């Protein structure tokens, strides 16, 4: 084994699956791969296992949007037992790749793909070892030996040449457990199997909030269909005061999933990596947000939707966002949901995209990788302006979830309150939380909810939250930061209390979430040198440099970037 390249994959969820696929597909028998998995099963990770889903939770992607694995979802569905199909109300004969499916079932698919890849590895002579029920407690870099030590919770140490961190989602607990009925996230959803006779506060309206709503609704009432096939909800008579109240900054619901023309978010019209490199070189070493907005959003729209293009061609980014948000703000969110549901239904029926929405998803994906080259000024613009619109429009809430939200609202058990930018939540020692906010009429509100659930989705974690302490102590990793293009703007931001630092050259830097990585997802140290041995694929720790990540597409793309570098 000594002469083999020893590679550790930390985490056997979807990211680990795509990384393992890349390694196995090389057919390289000079590799020795070890997968460390905290649980007793590979593939499903958090979102597609009981840690992140119950039977009622569905994916927001369909088979045709999943990057290729070993077998297609369509073919796999034909191989599963009738009991499983019946449990999830799936007819294998009528199943097609355009349908979303239950998350737990999708988790089984990912596990099956991992099994097939292991079989492939055995057949091609690629050495691998899976360490189930193993938690990695530390990563110790040994540059002098060109190796990395992985330490597990039981104190055991193993040496590797390369480590790829694929640890997936992480929701730190702040008050959950010490404050009754206060939840830092809705996961695992089994904890929300609660019968409640009071209003429940839900922070956020993202897909994470929809997960919480789907679970709570089932424990406090029933869904049925009327004679026209329309869904309606009846709360239990014993719970007359049960209600769910979503709180959002802008009082908006996510947009409804529609037919995507290019299901993998990789559009032919996008700027190439070389074009982006050339642009950065010509622009003082910065990527311009306006340039990306013109080239990766407006131009493709000109060809596909010339009428829409005429409306937006002279708009700057902020103006475009304000325009789109204003359209959403004018309408009651549930009326808008109803209208978008009908529009999305037509889009799916006729397999015709809603092109500007699709391109917004493409723009978000295209911005993700080079975002670390934005100036601090442009990153602030992105976070303040574009990100809120993107998070609403490309959430792609599935049809059945839209139907449930509309039925719950009609039954009077679901409402949405806009709370603005300055709202604050305080845990209440008796249970739940106090929601402090300014309402639409500029009145200060302070409302106690006996149950509170934070549903804003995966937070971008701070540098200090990285669980592998030796990486921080030995300065193997460093906090992510972005340079200000203008020193005046940097000074202004520093004086206004933003996390800004100044170096010896007089340049100003904005601290952003997570750690510093390069374009190959290698971690970087305090001196700006990249590490040949350690790769970071765990999205919660690179949020500053990767502001948007699109699940499986992200795993597919990044594993491809890493394998190129590993196999040099």
Predicted regions and their residues:
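Flavin (primarily FAD) cofactor-binding/catalytic cores of flavoenzymes
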Residues: 1-46, 50, 93-568
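N-terminal glycine-rich dinucleotide-binding loop that anchors FAD/FMN and/or NAD(P) in oxidoreductases
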Residues: 50-75, 242-243, 265-272
């Amino acid at each position: 084994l000594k002469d083999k390249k020893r590679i550790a994959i930390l985490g056997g969820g979807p990211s680990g699956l795509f990384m393992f696929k890349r390694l196995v597909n090389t057919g390289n028998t000079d590799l020795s791969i070890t997968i460390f998995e905290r649980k007793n099963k590979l593939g499903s990770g958090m979102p597609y296992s009981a840690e992140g889903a119950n039977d009622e939770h569905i994916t927001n992607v369909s088979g045709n949007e999943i990057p290729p694995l070993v077998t297609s979802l369509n073919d796999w569905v034909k191989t599963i037992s009738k009991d499983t199909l019946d449990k999830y109300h799936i007819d294998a004969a009528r199943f097609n790749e355009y349908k979303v499916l239950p998350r737990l079932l999708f988790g089984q698919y990912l596990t099956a793909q991992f099994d097939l890849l292991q079989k492939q590895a055995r057949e091609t002579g690629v050495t691998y070892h899976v360490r189930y029920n193993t938690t990695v407690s530390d990563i110790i870099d040994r540059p002098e030996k060109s190796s990395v030590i992985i330490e597990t919770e039981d104190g055991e140490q193993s040496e590797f040449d390369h480590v790829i961190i694929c640890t997936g989602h992480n929701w730190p607990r702040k008050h959950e457990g010490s404050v009754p009925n206060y939840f830092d996230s809705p996961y695992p959803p089994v904890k929300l199997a609660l019968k409640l006779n009071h209003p429940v506060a839900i922070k956020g309206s993202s897909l994470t909030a929809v997960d919480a709503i789907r679970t709570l609704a089932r424990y406090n009432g029933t869904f049925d269909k009327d004679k026209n096939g329309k869904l309606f909800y009846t709360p239990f008579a014993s719970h007359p005061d049960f209600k769910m109240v979503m709180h959002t900054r802008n009082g908006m619901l996510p947009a409804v999933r529609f037919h995507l023309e290019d299901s993998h978010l990789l559009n032919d019209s996008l700027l190439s990596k070389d074009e982006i490199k050339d642009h950065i070189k010509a622009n003082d070493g910065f990527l311009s947000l306006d340039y990306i907005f013109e080239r990766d959003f407006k131009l493709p729209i000109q060809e596909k939707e010339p009428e829409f293009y005429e409306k937006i061609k002279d708009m700057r980014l902020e103006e475009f966002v304000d325009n789109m948000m204003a359209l959403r703000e004018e309408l009651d969110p549930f009326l808008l949901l109803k209208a978008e549901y009908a529009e999305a239904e037509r889009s799916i029926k006729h397999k015709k995209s809603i092109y500007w929405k699709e391109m917004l998803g493409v723009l978000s994906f295209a911005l993700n990788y080079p975002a670390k080259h934005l100036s601090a000024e442009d990153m602030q613009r992105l976070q303040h302006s574009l990100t809120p619109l993107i998070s609403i429009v490309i959430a792609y809430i599935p049809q059945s979830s839209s139907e449930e939200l509309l039925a719950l609202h009609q039954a009077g058990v679901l409402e949405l309150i806009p709370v603005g930018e300055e709202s604050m939540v305080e845990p209440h020692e008796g249970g739940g939380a106090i929601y402090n906010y300014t309402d639409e009429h500029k009145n200060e509100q302070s409302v106690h909810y006996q149950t509170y659930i934070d549903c804003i989705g995966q937070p971008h974690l701070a540098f200090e939250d990285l669980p592998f302490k030796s990486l921080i102590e030995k300065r193997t990793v460093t906090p992510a930061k972005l340079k200000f293009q203008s020193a005046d703007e940097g000074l202004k931001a520093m004086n206004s209390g933003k996390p800004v630092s100044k170096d010896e050259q007089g340049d100003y830097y904005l601290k952003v979430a997570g750690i510093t990585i390069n374009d190959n997802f290698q971690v970087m140290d305090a001196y700006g040198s990249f590490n040949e041995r350690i790769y970071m694929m765990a999205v919660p720790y690179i949020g500053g440099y990767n502001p948007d990540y699109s699940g499986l597409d992200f795993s597919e793309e990044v594993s491809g970037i890493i394998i190129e570098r590993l196999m040099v």
